[in-house]
Amino acid sequence: SKKEDSCQLDHAQGPCLGMISRYFYNGTSMACETFQYGGCLGNGNNFASQKECLQTCRTVAACNLPIVQGPCRAFIRLWAFDAAQGKCVLFTYGGCRGNGNKFYSQKECKEYCGIPGDGDEELLR
C-alpha cells in the first residue's frame, strides 16, 4: 500500500526494545509528533524526520492552521501559509512541535496552498 495510506494509522512502537526517536503523523492535530520506536515491526506511520513525515502526510487543511513557532529555541527559517494575507510567508521555526503549516521552500508552500490566479503563472500552466 502507498506510504500516504499509513498516515491514518496509530503509531506503533512494535515488540522490540530499542528506543529510537521517530515521527508519526497525528491526523487530529495535523502535526508530526515524536514517539519511541522499538526498532522492529510497527507500521508505516513511522518517519525518520519531521520533514519526511510532513511531506508524506500533510494535507491542504494544513494551510488553514495558525503559524506556530513552537517552544524550542532554534532559529530555522521556514515557510508557512498566512491565510489572512492569502500567501506564503517566511517565519522562524523553533525546531520542535508546531503543526503541519510548515514548508521547507516557498515552492512547496505554494504547491500546497497557492491560490490559482494569484499572478503565479506556474500554477496556471
From Swiss-Prot:
Cited SUPFAM superfamilies: BPTI-like
Gene3D superfamilies recorded: Pancreatic trypsin inhibitor Kunitz domain
Domain of life: Eukaryota
Family annotation (InterPro entries): AMBP, Kunitz_BPTI, Kunitz_BPTI_sf, Prtase_inh_Kunz-CS
Keyword tags: Disulfide bond, Glycoprotein, Protease inhibitor, Repeat, Secreted, Serine protease inhibitor
Residues of this chain annotated as glycosylated in UniProt: N26
Any one cellular-component term (Gene Ontology): extracellular region
UniProt keyword NAD present: no
One Pfam family matching this protein: Kunitz_BPTI
PROSITE patterns reported for this sequence: BPTI_KUNITZ_1, BPTI_KUNITZ_2
Site (Reactive bond for trypsin): R73, A74
Main subcellular location: secreted
MF term (GO), any: serine-type endopeptidase inhibitor activity
Disulphide bond pairs: C7-C57, C16-C40, C32-C53, C63-C113, C72-C96, C88-C109
Segments forming domain BPTI/Kunitz inhibitor: 7-57, 63-113
Localization, UniProt: Secreted
Further details from the record: The amino acid at position p2' (17) appears to determine the specificity of the inhibition of domain I. Inhibitors with methionine in this position interact weakly with chymotrypsin and elastase; those with leucine interact strongly.
Function: This inhibitory fragment, released from native ITI after limited proteolysis with trypsin, contains two homologous domains. Whereas the second domain is a strong inhibitor of trypsin, the first domain interacts weakly with PMN-granulocytic elastase and not at all with pancreatic elastase.
PANTHER family in the cross-refs: PROTEIN AMBP
Protein name as catalogued: Inter-alpha-trypsin inhibitor
Source organism: Equus caballus (Horse)
